[in-house]
Amino acid sequence: MTLEKIKKYLISKINIKFIEIYDDSQFHHYSKKGLTHLRIIIISDDFINQTLINRHRIIFSMLSKMIEKKIYSLTLNTYTLNEWKDKKLKKTSNVKCVKKNNIL
């Protein structure tokens, strides 16, 4: 599984205005296992009148078979085009996990 494969698959399923997928695996202690932590920003007017949880359900249901048992963490940022413009978001911040004394 590659980031490009995930991107193409999502584009084929919903009307996406913008999509960016980031591999945040290097920020986590699981990074030696390959692609484990993803962050996806999706802008689509298919999200109009959808609650945040429903937007995430839509994406999770599309990706469930692709990421099952492979991805440890999936962060979704889902917006309509107007929401994206209103917030003037360019990129979400990275979440950095710190492992101290084997406790996260």
Swiss-Prot record:
Superkingdom of this entry's organism? Bacteria
Q: What Gene3D superfamilies does UniProt report for this protein, alphabetically?
A: BolA-like (3.30.300.90)
Q: Which family does it belong to?
A: Belongs to the BolA/IbaG family.
Q: Name one Pfam family in it.
A: BolA
Species the sequence originates in: Buchnera aphidicola subsp. Acyrthosiphon pisum (strain APS)
- Protein name per Swiss-Prot or TrEMBL: Uncharacterized protein BU473
